[in-house]
């Protein structure tokens, strides 16, 4: 099962992070959480393990109107929120990989009517954000 939408861009990591933030904002998403995986691994494991992962940022993106609709439709759906967006250094020089969770995979766990429509709208917005990069 494919659970991610992925694009690779030819821009440096830090520049791509800002581009992703801007693209998500344009689509009505705010960033609720931010996990710098490299820094966390350096602090909790070792610098060598952090370097093996490289630059890797997990952004927890939330579109408040969609989240409100989802939570009022199925209160348990909050266990699957927010939508994760990963920005990580790509394999090639100057490449950065951006990935977003496919909301359709998340809502397969809910049997509440209406959740699929909300997930489709979130998916459309996430794809638009990735497409603008």
Describe these PLM feature segments.
Residues 18-19, 36, 73, 121, ...:
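Short Gly/charged-rich anion-binding patches and loops
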Residues 7, 83-85:
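A structural signal for short, well-ordered beta-strand segments
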Residues 1-28:
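Terminal, regulation- and interaction-focused segments at domain boundaries
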Residues 87-111:
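Beta-strand/loop substructures that line and gate deep hydrophobic ligand-binding cavities in soluble
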Residues 30-32, 37-81:
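Compact, glycine-rich, soluble single-domain proteins
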Residues 107-133:
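Well-ordered alpha/beta subsegment
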Residues 22-26, 76, 128-131:
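Short, intrinsically disordered, mixed-charge
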């Amino acid at each position: 099962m494919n659970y991610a939408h992925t694009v690779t861009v030819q821009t440096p990591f830090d520049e791509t992070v800002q581009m992703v933030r801007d693209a998500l904002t344009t689509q009505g998403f705010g960033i609720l959480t931010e996990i710098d995986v490299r820094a966390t691994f350096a602090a909790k494991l070792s610098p060598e393990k952090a370097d093996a992962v490289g630059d890797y940022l997990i952004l927890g993106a939330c579109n408040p109107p969609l989240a409100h609709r989802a939570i009022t439709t199925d209160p348990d759906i909050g266990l699957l929120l927010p939508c994760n967006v990963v920005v990580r250094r790509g394999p090639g020089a100057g490449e950065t990989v951006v990935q977003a969770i496919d909301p359709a995979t998340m809502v397969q766990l809910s049997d509440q009517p209406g959740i699929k429509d909300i997930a489709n709208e979130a998916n459309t917005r996430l794809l638009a954000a990735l497409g603008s990069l």
